[in-house]
Regions:
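Glycine-rich, basic loop-to-helix element that forms the pyrophosphate-binding segment
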Residues: 1-6
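Short, high-confidence coil segments that cap the C-terminus of an alpha-helix
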Residues: 8, 34-37, 119-120
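Short aromatic/hydrophobic "clamp" motif used to bind/position activated sugar donors
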Residues: 11
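The conserved acidic donor/metal-binding loop of glycosyltransferases
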Residues: 15-19
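Flexible acidic/His/Gly-enriched loops in nucleotide-sugar-dependent glycosyltransferase catalytic domains
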Residues: 21-93
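Conserved nucleotide-sugar donor-binding catalytic segment
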Residues: 66-145
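Non-catalytic, C-terminal membrane-associated alpha-helical segments of glycosyltransferases
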Residues: 148-155, 169-190
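Amphipathic alpha-helices of TPR/Sel1-like and other helical repeat/solenoid scaffolds
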Residues: 153-164
Length: 190
């Protein structure tokens, strides 16, 4: 429902467990052109210990992308597209597309794949636009057993495949393939 209620030309998603720096929106908006996605600096921490930054694959991706003049969805930036947070997205990219609520896990990644056919350019902020990603031990990502993860991954792979092959000319094969690999990885490593 939140997407339908959003007003304006760009949308920022912030998970209810997470928070952002005071300059987050201002810094992100300063790079918005209307047809680009803007990504920021991700800072991961365990609940109750925000002063201790955790190693985080998306922070590593940020460090590899920052300072580059051209950032592609096939670059390390693809790690940012496992979910809608940590970025500003043009509302036009989303249109009538919505999260698939049949999925308890993976719906964020599926949504981002669904809108990936719209991605033209990616811009990256300086490190002071921070998205603080909080890890909680009781998060939905940690609560499913292997049988549930396997079933969910199969359903996700099926949906990625349906979207890709229905509009094969619009979607990037490498990005599609990395979503399939990510779904398989989620079975073993939640």
């Amino acid at each position: 429902k939140g997407i339908s209620e959003a007003k304006g030309d760009i949308i920022a998603f912030i998970d209810d467990d997470d928070y952002v720096s005071t300059t987050y929106l201002q810094e992100m908006q300063s790079l918005t052109t209307g047809d680009n996605i803007v990504i920021c600096y991700p800072y991961a921490f365990n609940d109750g210990h925000p002063e201790q930054q955790l190693p985080y694959r998306i922070t590593n991706a940020y460090n590899q992308c920052v300072g580059k003049s051209h950032i592609s969805i096939n670059s390390m930036a693809r790690k940012f597209f496992s979910g809608p947070c940590m970025k500003l997205i043009p509302a036009s990219y989303i249109g009538e597309k919505r999260f698939d609520l049949r999925f308890k896990n993976g719906e964020d990644s599926l949504f981002m794949f669904f809108i990936s056919n719209q991605i033209k350019t990616i811009s990256i902020t300086k490190q002071n636009a921070i998205y603080y990603r909080r890890y909680r031990s009781n998060s939905a990502n940690f609560s499913t057993n292997i049988k549930q993860r396997f079933y969910n991954a199969l359903r996700l792979i099926s949906e990625y495949t349906r979207i890709y092959f229905t509009h094969i000319q619009e979607y990037n094969f490498i990005f599609f393939f990395t979503r399939i690999l990510g779904s398989i990885r989620s079975i073993i490593n939640p």
